[in-house]
Amino acid sequence: MKHRLNALLTEKGFTCHDEVECVDEDGSNRRIDILAIDPGDANKAYIIDPTVRYETNDDLDTIVQIEKARIYEPCIEDVKRRYPQYAQRDFEVIGLWFGSRGSIGKGVKNFFKKFKLEKKHIPDIAETVLADSINILHNHIYSNHTP
């Protein structure tokens, strides 16, 4: 899913960096899934962190966004030090959740709209997430590893 989002953004002209290492204000190591640099706005950069969660009745769009902002906003100064060519940009953290059963929230739809990505890719991404979830379950059930 992360690689697909990276590819879609790259096709739109964004410069994307994958698995960006950084350190937060407390010295904890973090890894940003996608650092995307906007080609059309010299003032914007995006820290994009998609995640897969089991769907609940909670507002997962809001929960994931708050969680990701809490994790990655304290890393922005370190990212600016590591990438001085982007130091003058305003950074925005975007947390995206994909449901482990193939669902998506409004946040994903809004992300596709904001970045002018074709929505026809959403079902393929959701299907990939679902297939990966099934594969993980299969490995847990049929693993030869005994505790």
Label for each model-derived stretch:
Residues 2-52:
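Active-site metal-binding core of divalent-cation-utilizing nuclease and nuclease-like domains
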Residues 1, 27, 64-68:
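Phosphate/oxyanion-binding active-site loops and adjacent basic polyanion-contact surfaces
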Residues 32, 38, 45-46, 50-147:
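Catalytic cores of nucleic-acid endonucleases
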